[in-house]
């Protein structure tokens, strides 16, 4: 059995299937770990959702900001933007089944020393604490107060963690860290405006994974979300968003030996790269 961690799909269904062919994925014995943002901006989010859902236990995903955006739009708590490509999901005959499945997915996945999250973890959060906090959001997504949670989810404040936070402010910070964060201060104050490269990070901020002595540093965190960062693999980090949507590549890493496989997006074929 092999486990393949795969970067942000964002509706790039053709490239996703090419990548699975490239690694010779066998759903009867292999596993896919998907870092979130299955949908939006790409051409075929509906096929991505249907395919991953049908994989059942052969695929594990964590929710990304675009996946949550789909849920909010469907619930009437957010508007479609010009760049959104979610209408075919909203119009699909199996819409309700797909959305119900999506809202029951994880925000955080932990397996041994591997931790998968879409964006990142705040510096003060241990893996154990992050699991507890993610479970709060997962419960809110699946519970009877789902609509109100959707109404309250969006917002940039509070922009840092405080143990005294409660209610929807507490949930909002957890969602923002795990699905939106790229950079923060050493004390964990997040900046959501920066989407560029590491060299352009605002003064006083740094990549969340570079904060000295962050509490999760002994685990290997698998994440996506930051396409301008590109592929970043370290002993304790696998950042896998390589910008397929923007003409980059779609990346998979086989966890057992850390071999990298990539489909070049928009280049008319799949190319294998090793690392």
From Swiss-Prot:
It catalyses: P(1),P(4)-bis(5'-adenosyl) tetraphosphate + H2O = 2 ADP + 2 H(+). SUPFAM superfamilies: Metallo-dependent phosphatases. Keywords: Hydrolase. Gene3D superfamilies: 3.60.21.10. Belongs to the Ap4A hydrolase family. Hydrolyzes diadenosine 5',5'''-P1,P4-tetraphosphate to yield ADP. This is Bis(5'-nucleosyl)-tetraphosphatase, symmetrical. It comes from Nitrosospira multiformis (strain ATCC 25196 / NCIMB 11849 / C 71). The gene is apaH.
């Amino acid at each position: 059995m092999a486990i393949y961690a795969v970067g942000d799909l964002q509706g790039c269904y053709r490239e996703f299937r090419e990548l699975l062919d490239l690694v010779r994925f066998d759903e009867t014995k292999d596993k896919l770990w998907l870092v979130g943002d299955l949908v939006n901006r790409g051409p075929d989010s509906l096929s991505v959702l249907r395919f991953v859902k049908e994989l059942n236990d052969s695929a594990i995903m964590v929710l990304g900001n675009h996946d949550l955006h789909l849920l909010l739009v469907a619930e009437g708590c957010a508007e479609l933007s010009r760049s959104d490509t979610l209408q075919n999901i909203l119009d699909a005959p199996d819409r309700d089944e797909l959305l119900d499945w999506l809202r029951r997915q994880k925000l955080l996945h932990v397996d041994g020393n591997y931790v998968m999250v879409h964006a990142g973890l705040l510096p003060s959060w241990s893996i154990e604490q992050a699991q507890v906090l993610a479970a709060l959001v997962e419960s809110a997504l699946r519970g009877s107060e789902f609509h109100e949670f959707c109404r309250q989810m969006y917002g940039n404040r509070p922009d840092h963690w405080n143990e005294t936070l409660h209610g929807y402010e507490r949930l909002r910070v957890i969602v923002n860290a795990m699905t939106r964060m790229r950079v923060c201060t050493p004390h964990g104050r997040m900046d959501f405006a920066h989407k560029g490269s590491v060299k352009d990070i605002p003064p006083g901020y740094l990549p969340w994974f570079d904060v000295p002595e962050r509490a999760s540093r002994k685990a290997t965190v698998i994440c996506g979300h930051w396409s301008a960062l590109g592929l970043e693999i370290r002993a304790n980090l696998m950042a896998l968003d390589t910008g397929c949507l923007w003409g980059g590549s779609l990346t998979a890493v086989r966890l057992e030996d850390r071999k990298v496989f990539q489909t070049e997006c928009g280049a008319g074929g799949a190319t294998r790269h090793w690392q």
